[in-house]
């Protein structure tokens, strides 16, 4: 499974020469109310098995959760379903807040 650090993702998102990946946030709705990375799409982990057909298998997808554990599980699931361009955000939104956006609310 590929991983990307929050700092690497921020750099990638700021590069207009690169196509933006889908930011798939698999946290629960109550977590999204606290904080989220701008532009992310919500799909709680428990709904992924029923909804993964909504995702583009050919689009690079960065999967996000609180610390990186749930997103790693979703990455592995998506890879088993034939998705080859999934990347886990190492450290999740907690890492994003620590490395990229210190103003982001944490929990």
Regions found by a protein language model. Give the residues of each.
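Short, surface-exposed ligand- or partner-binding patches at beta-edge/loop junctions that are enriched
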Residues: 64-65
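Rhodanese-like catalytic fold shared by cysteine-dependent sulfurtransferases
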Residues: 1-21, 28-60, 70-107
């Amino acid at each position: 499974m590929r991983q990307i650090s929050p700092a690497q993702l921020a750099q990638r998102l700021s590069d207009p020469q690169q196509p933006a990946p889908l930011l798939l946030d698999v946290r629960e709705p109550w977590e999204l109310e606290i904080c989220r990375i701008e532009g992310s799409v919500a799909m709680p982990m428990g709904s992924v098995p029923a909804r993964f057909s909504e995702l583009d298998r050919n689009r690079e997808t960065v999967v996000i959760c609180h610390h990186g554990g749930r997103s790693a599980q979703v990455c592995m699931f998506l890879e088993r379903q034939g998705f080859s361009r999934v990347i886990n955000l190492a450290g999740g939104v907690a890492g994003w807040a620590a490395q990229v956006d210190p103003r982001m609310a944490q929990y």
